[in-house]
Design a protein with these regions (language model features):
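Residue-level signal for the short linker/turn that defines the boundary of a DNA-recognition helix
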Residues: 8-9, 55, 75, 242
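Double-stranded DNA-binding cores of transcription factors and transposases
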Residues: 1-12, 17
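Mobile-element integrase/transposase regions
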Residues: 74-144, 166-170, 177-184, 289, ...
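C-terminal domain-tail junction helix/linker
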Residues: 204-208, 230-300
Protein backbone atom coordinates (compact mmCIF):
# COMPACT_ATOMS: atom_id res chain seq x y z
CA UNK A 1 0.00 0.00 0.00
CA UNK A 2 2.86 2.40 0.81
CA UNK A 3 4.12 1.94 -2.77
CA UNK A 4 0.82 3.36 -4.07
CA UNK A 5 1.35 6.63 -2.18
CA UNK A 6 5.03 7.50 -2.60
CA UNK A 7 4.52 11.15 -1.63
CA UNK A 8 3.39 10.27 1.91
CA UNK A 9 6.22 9.92 4.41
CA UNK A 10 6.62 6.63 6.21
CA UNK A 11 6.02 8.26 9.60
CA UNK A 12 2.70 9.78 8.44
CA UNK A 13 1.70 6.56 6.71
CA UNK A 14 2.22 4.60 9.94
CA UNK A 15 0.24 7.18 11.95
CA UNK A 16 -2.68 6.91 9.50
CA UNK A 17 -2.70 3.13 9.89
CA UNK A 18 -2.21 3.28 13.64
CA UNK A 19 0.96 1.17 13.62
CA UNK A 20 4.57 1.72 14.60
CA UNK A 21 7.47 1.84 12.19
CA UNK A 22 8.78 -1.35 13.79
CA UNK A 23 5.49 -3.13 13.02
CA UNK A 24 5.63 -1.86 9.42
CA UNK A 25 9.16 -3.19 8.88
CA UNK A 26 8.36 -6.47 10.63
CA UNK A 27 5.43 -7.00 8.26
CA UNK A 28 7.65 -6.62 5.19
CA UNK A 29 10.39 -8.77 6.69
CA UNK A 30 7.84 -11.52 7.30
CA UNK A 31 6.62 -11.28 3.68
CA UNK A 32 10.20 -11.56 2.48
CA UNK A 33 10.80 -14.61 4.70
CA UNK A 34 7.64 -16.30 3.37
CA UNK A 35 8.65 -15.59 -0.22
CA UNK A 36 12.12 -17.02 0.41
CA UNK A 37 10.70 -20.15 2.07
CA UNK A 38 8.27 -20.74 -0.78
CA UNK A 39 11.03 -20.39 -3.37
CA UNK A 40 13.21 -22.83 -1.42
CA UNK A 41 10.36 -25.35 -1.38
CA UNK A 42 9.60 -24.88 -5.09
CA UNK A 43 13.26 -25.39 -6.02
CA UNK A 44 13.48 -28.53 -3.86
CA UNK A 45 10.28 -29.96 -5.37
CA UNK A 46 11.56 -29.30 -8.89
CA UNK A 47 14.70 -31.26 -8.01
CA UNK A 48 12.62 -34.17 -6.70
CA UNK A 49 10.44 -34.04 -9.81
CA UNK A 50 13.55 -34.67 -11.93
CA UNK A 51 13.97 -38.00 -10.13
CA UNK A 52 10.27 -38.82 -9.57
CA UNK A 53 8.32 -37.03 -12.36
CA UNK A 54 4.78 -37.74 -11.15
CA UNK A 55 5.21 -38.58 -7.47
CA UNK A 56 2.01 -37.54 -5.67
CA UNK A 57 1.79 -34.53 -3.37
CA UNK A 58 1.33 -36.60 -0.22
CA UNK A 59 4.48 -38.61 -0.84
CA UNK A 60 6.34 -35.41 -1.71
CA UNK A 61 5.25 -34.01 1.65
CA UNK A 62 6.78 -37.05 3.32
CA UNK A 63 10.06 -36.82 1.37
CA UNK A 64 10.32 -33.09 2.14
CA UNK A 65 10.30 -33.52 5.94
CA UNK A 66 14.12 -33.61 6.35
CA UNK A 67 14.34 -30.52 4.10
CA UNK A 68 11.75 -28.68 6.22
CA UNK A 69 13.65 -29.55 9.39
CA UNK A 70 16.98 -28.43 7.94
CA UNK A 71 15.57 -25.05 6.91
CA UNK A 72 13.20 -24.68 9.89
CA UNK A 73 10.20 -24.37 7.59
CA UNK A 74 6.71 -24.73 9.02
CA UNK A 75 4.15 -25.72 6.40
CA UNK A 76 1.14 -28.02 6.45
CA UNK A 77 0.19 -30.54 3.80
CA UNK A 78 -2.69 -28.47 2.40
CA UNK A 79 -0.51 -25.36 2.22
CA UNK A 80 2.09 -27.38 0.32
CA UNK A 81 -0.58 -28.54 -2.15
CA UNK A 82 -1.66 -24.91 -2.68
CA UNK A 83 1.96 -23.93 -3.32
CA UNK A 84 2.41 -26.81 -5.79
CA UNK A 85 -0.78 -25.82 -7.61
CA UNK A 86 0.25 -22.15 -7.79
CA UNK A 87 3.53 -23.16 -9.41
CA UNK A 88 2.15 -25.78 -11.79
CA UNK A 89 3.73 -28.66 -9.89
CA UNK A 90 0.68 -30.85 -9.33
CA UNK A 91 0.44 -33.84 -11.66
CA UNK A 92 -2.40 -35.57 -13.46
CA UNK A 93 -2.01 -39.28 -14.05
CA UNK A 94 -2.77 -40.76 -17.46
CA UNK A 95 -4.49 -44.11 -17.87
CA UNK A 96 -4.18 -46.42 -20.85
CA UNK A 97 -4.32 -50.20 -21.14
CA UNK A 98 -2.78 -52.67 -23.56
CA UNK A 99 -3.34 -56.36 -22.83
CA UNK A 100 -0.23 -58.49 -22.41
CA UNK A 101 -1.76 -61.73 -21.13
CA UNK A 102 -2.49 -64.74 -23.31
CA UNK A 103 -4.07 -67.44 -21.15
CA UNK A 104 -5.37 -69.55 -24.07
CA UNK A 105 -2.63 -72.17 -24.20
CA UNK A 106 -2.10 -75.84 -23.40
CA UNK A 107 0.39 -75.41 -20.52
CA UNK A 108 -0.67 -76.41 -17.02
CA UNK A 109 -2.39 -73.65 -15.01
CA UNK A 110 -1.95 -73.56 -11.24
CA UNK A 111 -4.52 -72.63 -8.54
CA UNK A 112 -4.58 -69.38 -6.60
CA UNK A 113 -2.84 -70.08 -3.27
CA UNK A 114 -3.15 -66.59 -1.80
CA UNK A 115 -6.87 -65.82 -1.83
CA UNK A 116 -7.01 -65.38 1.95
CA UNK A 117 -3.30 -65.26 2.74
CA UNK A 118 -0.90 -62.33 3.09
CA UNK A 119 2.87 -62.51 3.76
CA UNK A 120 4.21 -61.61 7.18
CA UNK A 121 7.74 -60.80 6.02
CA UNK A 122 9.98 -60.34 2.97
CA UNK A 123 10.46 -63.13 0.41
CA UNK A 124 7.40 -65.12 1.39
CA UNK A 125 5.47 -64.00 -1.69
CA UNK A 126 6.68 -62.67 -5.03
CA UNK A 127 4.22 -61.27 -7.55
CA UNK A 128 4.92 -61.01 -11.27
CA UNK A 129 3.35 -59.14 -14.15
CA UNK A 130 4.10 -57.71 -17.61
CA UNK A 131 3.31 -54.26 -18.98
CA UNK A 132 4.16 -52.38 -22.17
CA UNK A 133 6.58 -49.45 -22.59
CA UNK A 134 6.30 -47.21 -25.69
CA UNK A 135 9.43 -46.18 -27.61
CA UNK A 136 9.97 -44.11 -30.75
CA UNK A 137 9.12 -46.93 -33.16
CA UNK A 138 7.57 -49.82 -31.22
CA UNK A 139 6.26 -51.12 -27.91
CA UNK A 140 8.62 -52.91 -25.55
CA UNK A 141 7.44 -55.29 -22.84
CA UNK A 142 8.52 -54.91 -19.23
CA UNK A 143 8.56 -57.93 -16.89
CA UNK A 144 8.77 -57.21 -13.17
CA UNK A 145 8.95 -59.45 -10.11
CA UNK A 146 8.12 -57.70 -6.84
CA UNK A 147 8.23 -58.79 -3.23
CA UNK A 148 4.63 -58.46 -2.04
CA UNK A 149 5.56 -57.60 1.56
CA UNK A 150 8.28 -54.97 1.10
CA UNK A 151 7.23 -53.90 -2.44
CA UNK A 152 10.88 -54.17 -3.45
CA UNK A 153 11.43 -54.92 -7.14
CA UNK A 154 13.50 -58.12 -7.16
CA UNK A 155 13.91 -58.70 -10.90
CA UNK A 156 13.17 -56.96 -14.18
CA UNK A 157 13.70 -57.27 -17.92
CA UNK A 158 12.64 -55.33 -21.03
CA UNK A 159 12.17 -57.09 -24.37
CA UNK A 160 10.83 -56.47 -27.87
CA UNK A 161 8.33 -59.33 -27.65
CA UNK A 162 6.37 -61.43 -25.16
CA UNK A 163 8.39 -64.63 -25.46
CA UNK A 164 8.80 -66.61 -22.24
CA UNK A 165 12.59 -66.39 -22.34
CA UNK A 166 12.39 -62.72 -21.34
CA UNK A 167 10.21 -63.24 -18.27
CA UNK A 168 12.65 -65.98 -17.30
CA UNK A 169 15.46 -63.39 -17.32
CA UNK A 170 13.53 -61.30 -14.79
CA UNK A 171 13.06 -64.39 -12.61
CA UNK A 172 16.78 -65.23 -12.75
CA UNK A 173 17.61 -61.71 -11.59
CA UNK A 174 15.12 -61.99 -8.73
CA UNK A 175 16.68 -65.27 -7.61
CA UNK A 176 20.13 -63.64 -7.61
CA UNK A 177 18.81 -60.89 -5.32
CA UNK A 178 17.17 -63.27 -2.87
CA UNK A 179 18.56 -62.72 0.64
CA UNK A 180 16.09 -64.27 3.12
CA UNK A 181 15.73 -68.00 3.75
CA UNK A 182 11.99 -68.58 3.87
CA UNK A 183 9.40 -70.60 1.98
CA UNK A 184 8.35 -68.62 -1.05
CA UNK A 185 5.29 -68.45 -3.29
CA UNK A 186 5.42 -67.00 -6.82
CA UNK A 187 2.07 -65.50 -7.90
CA UNK A 188 1.21 -64.37 -11.44
CA UNK A 189 -1.55 -64.41 -14.02
CA UNK A 190 -2.08 -67.46 -16.23
CA UNK A 191 -0.19 -66.04 -19.18
CA UNK A 192 1.79 -68.34 -21.43
CA UNK A 193 5.07 -66.84 -20.21
CA UNK A 194 4.48 -67.88 -16.58
CA UNK A 195 3.13 -71.34 -17.49
CA UNK A 196 5.97 -72.16 -19.89
CA UNK A 197 8.14 -75.19 -19.19
CA UNK A 198 11.38 -73.26 -18.61
CA UNK A 199 9.76 -70.77 -16.24
CA UNK A 200 7.92 -73.39 -14.19
CA UNK A 201 11.01 -75.62 -13.99
CA UNK A 202 13.12 -72.73 -12.71
CA UNK A 203 10.58 -72.09 -9.95
CA UNK A 204 10.48 -75.76 -8.98
CA UNK A 205 14.29 -76.07 -9.01
CA UNK A 206 14.36 -73.32 -6.38
CA UNK A 207 11.57 -74.87 -4.27
CA UNK A 208 9.18 -72.02 -4.99
CA UNK A 209 5.47 -72.77 -4.85
CA UNK A 210 3.42 -71.67 -7.86
CA UNK A 211 0.21 -69.64 -7.54
CA UNK A 212 -1.84 -68.10 -10.36
CA UNK A 213 -4.93 -65.97 -10.80
CA UNK A 214 -8.07 -67.83 -11.77
CA UNK A 215 -10.34 -65.45 -13.69
CA UNK A 216 -8.17 -62.68 -15.14
CA UNK A 217 -9.34 -60.11 -12.60
CA UNK A 218 -6.56 -57.54 -11.80
CA UNK A 219 -7.74 -57.66 -8.18
CA UNK A 220 -6.28 -61.17 -8.00
CA UNK A 221 -2.79 -59.69 -8.48
CA UNK A 222 -3.14 -56.06 -7.33
CA UNK A 223 0.39 -55.44 -6.04
CA UNK A 224 2.03 -56.55 -9.28
CA UNK A 225 -0.41 -54.41 -11.31
CA UNK A 226 0.27 -51.43 -9.06
CA UNK A 227 4.07 -51.65 -9.17
CA UNK A 228 4.11 -52.09 -12.95
CA UNK A 229 1.91 -49.00 -13.21
CA UNK A 230 4.23 -46.97 -11.00
CA UNK A 231 7.36 -47.83 -12.97
CA UNK A 232 5.70 -47.21 -16.32
CA UNK A 233 3.43 -44.23 -15.59
CA UNK A 234 5.48 -42.38 -12.98
CA UNK A 235 8.88 -42.89 -14.58
CA UNK A 236 9.41 -44.51 -17.99
CA UNK A 237 6.55 -42.72 -19.78
CA UNK A 238 8.29 -39.39 -19.09
CA UNK A 239 11.33 -40.18 -21.21
CA UNK A 240 11.57 -40.31 -24.99
CA UNK A 241 12.96 -43.81 -25.33
CA UNK A 242 14.57 -44.74 -28.64
CA UNK A 243 15.27 -48.45 -28.28
CA UNK A 244 15.56 -51.45 -25.99
CA UNK A 245 19.17 -50.74 -24.96
CA UNK A 246 18.34 -47.23 -23.80
CA UNK A 247 15.20 -48.47 -22.05
CA UNK A 248 17.11 -51.14 -20.11
CA UNK A 249 19.78 -48.64 -19.01
CA UNK A 250 17.13 -46.20 -17.83
CA UNK A 251 15.17 -48.96 -16.12
CA UNK A 252 18.16 -49.85 -13.95
CA UNK A 253 18.30 -46.27 -12.66
CA UNK A 254 14.52 -46.08 -12.23
CA UNK A 255 14.35 -49.31 -10.22
CA UNK A 256 17.08 -48.01 -7.89
CA UNK A 257 15.15 -44.77 -7.36
CA UNK A 258 11.98 -46.74 -6.73
CA UNK A 259 13.56 -49.24 -4.32
CA UNK A 260 15.72 -46.81 -2.36
CA UNK A 261 13.85 -43.46 -2.45
CA UNK A 262 10.12 -43.77 -3.15
CA UNK A 263 7.90 -44.16 -0.05
CA UNK A 264 4.74 -46.30 -0.07
CA UNK A 265 1.57 -45.90 1.96
CA UNK A 266 1.19 -49.66 2.17
CA UNK A 267 4.52 -49.95 4.01
CA UNK A 268 3.99 -46.99 6.35
CA UNK A 269 5.63 -44.49 3.99
CA UNK A 270 8.95 -46.33 4.20
CA UNK A 271 11.04 -47.28 1.18
CA UNK A 272 10.94 -50.86 -0.16
CA UNK A 273 14.67 -51.41 0.39
CA UNK A 274 14.51 -50.33 4.03
CA UNK A 275 11.58 -52.62 4.77
CA UNK A 276 13.07 -55.55 2.84
CA UNK A 277 16.57 -55.52 4.30
CA UNK A 278 15.52 -54.84 7.89
CA UNK A 279 12.34 -56.95 7.85
CA UNK A 280 10.42 -54.00 9.24
CA UNK A 281 6.92 -54.65 10.46
CA UNK A 282 4.29 -52.93 8.33
CA UNK A 283 0.53 -52.63 8.62
CA UNK A 284 -1.58 -53.73 5.68
CA UNK A 285 -3.61 -50.71 4.61
CA UNK A 286 -7.05 -50.65 3.10
CA UNK A 287 -9.43 -47.91 1.97
CA UNK A 288 -8.62 -44.25 2.38
CA UNK A 289 -5.10 -42.90 2.23
CA UNK A 290 -3.54 -42.59 5.64
CA UNK A 291 -0.51 -40.57 6.59
CA UNK A 292 1.28 -41.46 9.84
CA UNK A 293 2.33 -38.80 12.29
CA UNK A 294 5.54 -37.17 11.05
CA UNK A 295 7.70 -35.66 13.75
CA UNK A 296 8.68 -32.14 12.71
CA UNK A 297 9.03 -29.48 15.39
CA UNK A 298 8.40 -26.77 12.80
CA UNK A 299 5.00 -28.01 11.63
CA UNK A 300 1.61 -28.13 13.34
Amino acid sequence: MKDSYPSISLARFCRLLGITRQAFYQHYWNLEDISTEEQLIVNEVKGLRQLHPVLGGRKLYCLLQPFFLEHQIKIGRDALFDLLAANGLLVRKRRRKIFTTNSKHWFKKYPNLIKTWYPQGPEQLWVADITYVPTADRFLYLSLITDAYSHRIMGYHIAENLEAVHTTQALKMALMHRSHASSLIHHSDRGLQYCSTDYVNLLKENNIEISMTENGDPLENPIAERINGIIKNEYLDHYKLKNQTQAMELLSSVVDRYNYQRPHYSINLQTPELVHVNKLRVNKRWGKNQIPNIVNQYQD
